[in-house]
Amino acid sequence: MNRIDKKFEVLKGEGRKALITFITAGDPDIETTYDIVLALEEAGSDIIELGIPYSDPLADGPTIQASSQRALNKGVKIPDIMKIVEKIRLKSDIPLVYLVYYNSIFKYGIQKFLKESKDVGIDGLIIPDLPIEERKDILEEADKYGIYLIPLVAPTSKERIKLITENGKGFVYCVSITGVTGAREDIETDIEEYMKTVSQYTNMPKAIGFGISTPEMAKKLKDFSDGIIVGSALVERIAKGYNKSEMLQEVKSFVSSLKEVL
């Protein structure tokens, strides 16, 4: 059984929601990524998304774009990320998902990327810019390696939700807003209606992401979903420029505060 399915099953049995955290692999550096992942797990993260740095991340706001750029400036490449995941797997069995842009996979080689992801212990992929029309090739390879393609839906894509979710696995990443990622004060979309719409088309667990920056927001949204995704607010804390141990402490206390309300 895929680690993602197993995790949602356990959480359901405990009556809890998933806390899914996002960081950019290689920011501030690749070795620190290893420490951050273990700190996230220790603080209560249930699933971790590792962003593969990309020069033109269309779905991301300024925080994650800057983070991606810092990693690229350090010369972080896909093989470095694969190696660090392999190292993480010696210590941890937490579900790990790559958030990766299609062009990165395409340039690396679809089959090569998926085989290596499988070999190091990646459980799923989120590909924000994957056109539905191009999905078939990746889906076939991903299925072959037991890697889940996690669908992304947005409030604007009502008629496309069925199409987007029908071959997805793991969970549905429900974008809570239209636009790019980034920590926000409030989330305007009528979440309840939106989640009901998504539920009409799929029984997969649903996780809400984009813009969740505080435990209060997470608490407000948890009743409508099976999980909460937090990225920019976490990446901001990593970028603050504390020394490493202070940064890890800050990350842990933020993640613990989110976990408490879920």
UniProtKB/Swiss-Prot annotation:
Taxonomy, superkingdom: Bacteria
EC number of this enzyme: 4.2.1.20
Pfam families, A to Z: Trp_syntA
Active-site residues annotated for this sequence: 49, 60
Keyword Amino-acid biosynthesis attached: yes
Protein task: The alpha subunit is responsible for the aldol cleavage of indoleglycerol phosphate to indole and glyceraldehyde 3-phosphate.
Subunit and interaction comment: Tetramer of two alpha and two beta chains.
The protein's name: Tryptophan synthase alpha chain
Organismal lineage: Bacteria, Bacillati, Bacillota, Clostridia, Thermoanaerobacterales
Gene name in the database record: trpA
